[in-house]
Amino acid sequence: MRAADLGNVPLQFKAKVRIGESEIARRWVPVRLPLWNIVLSGYPASGKTMLARRLVSDNANFVRLSVDDLRGMFYGPVQPPKEEEFVYDQLAALRDLILRSRRSVVLDSTAPRNSTRRFLLNTRVEGVVRLLVVLLVERSELEGRNQERGLVGAVDAWNRTWENPQTNMPVMKFRNNSLAEFETSYYVLTDLLRSKINPYRRRFIAHLFPKIRDAKS
């Protein structure tokens, strides 16, 4: 390949080898990006869809799967609770199909219970890094956002079903009380996704479970 062709090659496939001040060779090293299965969990209006769409927009290797979108595709505006198991089974099948194609997945779901979180996190595809991202918003802010949507009482309703994540789950806290806080949390998350070593190193400890305050407080 000619040197003039280098500009057309993705950056992740370029590697420069230097000795002293002179560049003596260029080696083409295929760098496999980490494969992620990211599950979002949070109250209504906590910013899950906003985060999922941002991840897909900023990362060409990510695909967003939404429980609500899939349910709507099958059943339209009606949401039959008895068919939830079918919806989640189809979601898991789509997730694994995408992961096998070597693309990362972000699952846009409320996932208030640990049983649902475990189901969405677990995959038979090998070499996948799992992460549960819990979006945290103060109760007063949540109530204001839901009132704007016409969902009065949504926070109280979700308080009855919400469970804090188990300590053995790979969890990151994502605080989203304001746009500025969203951007700060997003910076930490993207830094974590690009990490080439164990993501649970010291610099990320402050953003990890178990010290999570939910909307009940």
Functional labels for PLM-detected ranges:
Residues 2-28:
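N-terminal pre-Walker A segment at the start of P-loop NTPase domains
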Residues 40:
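Hydrophobic anchor at the beta1->P-loop junction of P-loop NTPases
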Residues 43:
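P-loop (Walker A) phosphate-binding loop of NTP-binding proteins
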Residues 46:
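ATP-binding Walker
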Residues 49-103, 143:
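Conserved substrate/cofactor phosphate-moiety recognition/catalytic segment
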Residues 83-130:
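Glycine-rich phosphate-binding loop used to anchor ATP phosphates in small-molecule kinases
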Residues 126-145:
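Conserved phosphate-donor/acceptor-positioning beta-strand/loop module used by diverse small-molecule
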Residues 149-217:
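Small-molecule kinase domains that catalyze NTP-dependent phosphoryl transfer to phosphate-bearing small molecules
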